[in-house]
Amino acid sequence: MSHSPAQLSASPSSVGDGDRLLRAARGEVVDRPPVWMMRQAGRYMAAYRELQSKYTFKQRCEIPELAIEISLQPFRAFAPDGVIMFSDILTPLEGMGIPFELVEQQGPIIDPPIRSQAQVEQIRLLEPEESLPFIKTILSTLRREVEGKATLLGFVGSPWTLACYAVEGRSSKDYAHIKSLAFTQPQVLHQLLSKLADSIARYVIYQIECGAQVVQLFDTWAGQLSPGDYETWALPYQKQIVDQVKARCPQVPLILYINGSAALLERVGKAGIDVFSLDWMSDMAEARARLGSLAVQGNLDPMVLLGSPKFIRQRTLEVIQKAGSRGHIMNLGHGVHHTTPEANVHHFFETVRQAAELLKAL
């Protein structure tokens, strides 16, 4: 595929130190915080929108040439320290016998939704190499492309969040169906979550074997649970994944992201993860104190990137200062908003790259 001069404006090789993110994820002190953005490959980029107009979302995720190109668009434009595979958290579900449809601007539709013991019993264990052959091509190619210049991230959905989609059948505001299942037929939901955890653990290990150096678990909707329910319905299945992955790949850092995690910060470390990805609704300094020795990722409000360059710089440096020098990966507290100007994203990345000098000048 051809690349316009604008896409080639940043030079990843010029920033060097391709393992900066990997080392920060292991809790090491680095020269500056590594930086990448959730949803950094996406609709805010003109280059992405051009492909979006020609190919379905499923095609963009599963045709290796497209997924590789989309993953590399922000790498060429902004030289982040982390490059994440372009995919979707629901991608492995079909290989488990849970078909879904991705509808533009609507999100995923799972019809029929999974709400009975009989349906749960039909779910099979994922065989990633058979069901997701494109993943190996995507990750192995990306690893070659970014080797020595950036850390390659894989990602998966965590069981509670995947179950939210499977049981609700679509995006939800109140999670009535899954909470009803939890509170009336708990054994059915526990069985579903355990099956999901075993398959997702396999998928994480497969991503690592294909080239991923760090893997992020998205349990986005676990923040919809009370602390007690989090310990019943989300935490054990996060841990089930982490335990299986660490038994096979002990050196690979695992990141956990939960949206709306403020009430859960003392609990998330029990999952055994290496890094907790913080949303923007918690103060970074307070969160670090509550998270203890865990490395942390985040947590700039994505909407800050709609502000002026001066405002973006100020708020970015505030987060970095509060996070301290050890075990911090700079990121947003959620995915970058699709209306964000690319120039503002560039300014955000440049601010982080210059953070040491800029903080000295304060």
Curated annotation (Swiss-Prot):
Record Gene3D superfamilies: 3.20.20.210
Subcellular localization, as worded in the UniProt entry: Cytoplasm
Catalyzed reaction equations: uroporphyrinogen III + 4 H(+) = coproporphyrinogen III + 4 CO2
GO CC field: cytoplasm
Listed Pfam families: URO-D
Record's keyword terms, sorted: Cytoplasm, Decarboxylase, Lyase, Porphyrin biosynthesis
Site (Transition state stabilizer): D88
Broad class of enzyme this protein falls into: lyase
UniProt EC number: 4.1.1.37
GO BP annotations listed: protoporphyrinogen IX biosynthetic process
Gene Ontology MF term list: uroporphyrinogen decarboxylase activity
Pathway given in the UniProt record: Porphyrin-containing compound metabolism; protoporphyrin-IX biosynthesis; coproporphyrinogen-III from 5-aminolevulinate: step 4/4
Chain residues that bind substrate: R39, Q40, A41, G42, R43, D88, Y165, T220, H334
NCBIfam families referenced in this protein's UniProt entry, alphabetically: hemE (TIGR01464)
SUBUNIT field: Homodimer.
The protein's role, per its UniProt record: Catalyzes the decarboxylation of four acetate groups of uroporphyrinogen-III to yield coproporphyrinogen-III.
Family statement drawn from the similarity comment of this UniProt entry: Belongs to the uroporphyrinogen decarboxylase family.
Protein name per the record: Uroporphyrinogen decarboxylase
Gene name, Swiss-Prot/TrEMBL: hemE
